[in-house]
């Protein structure tokens, strides 16, 4: 059994991040691309610094209260439809997702706390508030494959 599985099945509280996009939107003057949102911020110094500050805050809080923490990659919209709508090349799907995972590994190393688990965040292919637009299972698996790999 993995450390993650043991942790979440232990009944012990686990801190998670939350509202990353909302925090960037309301706490900073940083402009986010409306299609890929925080996924593209790692390509820019100011965006990267803000994301590091936000994620580090969750790690710091977990350390302060001796809790495990799960932080999710800023990749909710780093998927085919949103990458296309942003006018980015399809190769950026893999690049942005790998970059985000590496970024959070760095945050974890700098945080001086264990355990810090990293979750790969995969969002919907369309509007998350319109469940009728959800893809059938097989089509969803194919659509999300480039992001998951």
Q: Can you say where each PLM-predicted feature lies in the sequence?
A:
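Domain-level signal for soluble alpha/beta catalytic cores
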Residues: 1-149
């Amino acid at each position: 059994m993995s450390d993650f599985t043991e942790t979440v099945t232990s009944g012990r509280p686990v801190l998670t991040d939350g509202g990353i996009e909302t925090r960037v939107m309301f706490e900073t003057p940083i402009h986010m691309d409306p299609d890929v949102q925080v996924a593209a911020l790692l390509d820019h110094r100011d965006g990267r610094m803000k994301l590091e500050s936000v994620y580090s805050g969750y790690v710091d809080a977990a350390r302060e209260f001796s809790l495990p923490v799960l932080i999710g990659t800023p990749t909710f919209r780093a998927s085919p439809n949103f990458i296309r709508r942003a006018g980015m090349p399809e190769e950026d799907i893999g690049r942005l997702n790998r970059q985000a995972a590496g970024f959070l590994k760095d945050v974890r190393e700098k945080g001086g706390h264990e355990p810090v688990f990293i979750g790969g965040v995969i969002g919907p292919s369309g509007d998350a508030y319109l469940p009728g637009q959800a893809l059938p299972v097989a089509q969803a698996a194919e659509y999300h494959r480039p992001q998951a790999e």
